[in-house]
Amino acid sequence: MSVKAIRNIIFDLGGVILNIDPQLTVDAFRNLGWNDFYESGNQPLIKELFRNLESGNSSPEAFRDNVRQMLKYQKDDAEIDTAWTAMILDIPADRIRYLEELKKSYRIFLLSNTNEIHRIKFHMRFEADFGYSFYDLFERNFYSHEMGMRKPNPQIYLQALKESNLEPEETLIIDDMEENIEAAKTTGMKVLHIQPGTLLESLPDYLKDNH
């Protein structure tokens, strides 16, 4: 049986296209007075809080209220959002130029575990830096909080494939998280696991060897 050529590429966002530093958010919350943020005893509760936001099970308003309860201080929405989005850094222009070139030969998509507070932040940053909507960079943007589930749930990959009418065997997915890559493999897609910030070093070589 012949191997089908890659026609579609699904990108992760954070660590692949967007530079992020989660430690900056940890530091920002500590600066708000959350001194035991992410210490071992709090980790399960914190992870549940973040995952509920990313899967759309919690609204931004409920998230902020939960953060206020944990802070035990009445910080306003803007202070909480600033701390929560502190991890969001830049999108290097050379990555965007590369994606714009890829669009000439491939259908490109985005599939990201994210939330509405972060989405607003990086969309605004992208438009300020590049002069057009982030929605226009990809054929379709799939966000976990809008889909009601998050990676590595295999169903999120299957739904993205179905809604975009993609054949798994013709689709490459790129992610910097090994657990997400392992889940994507179960759908029949081709996979590329990269280290954060190495898209321009990793993808061209992969496509050259797997054209």
Residue ranges and their predicted role:
Residues 26, 96-100, 181:
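Short amphipathic alpha-helical segments and helix-helix/interface helices
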Residues 94-105, 137:
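Catalytic-core regions built around general acid/base machinery
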Residues 12-15, 56, 102, 110, ...:
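Generic structural signal for small/hydrophobic residues in well-ordered secondary structure
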Residues 1-7, 116, 122-211:
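Asp-based, Mg2+/Mn2+-dependent phosphohydrolase catalytic module
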Residues 95-98, 112-120:
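Alpha-helical transmembrane segments and their immediate juxtamembrane flanks
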Residues 3-93, 104, 115:
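N-terminal helical cap/lid subdomain that shapes the substrate entry/recognition surface
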Residues 108-110, 191:
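Hydrophobic beta-strand scaffold residues
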Residues 33-36, 72, 106, 165, ...:
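Glycine-centered loop/turn motif at secondary-structure junctions
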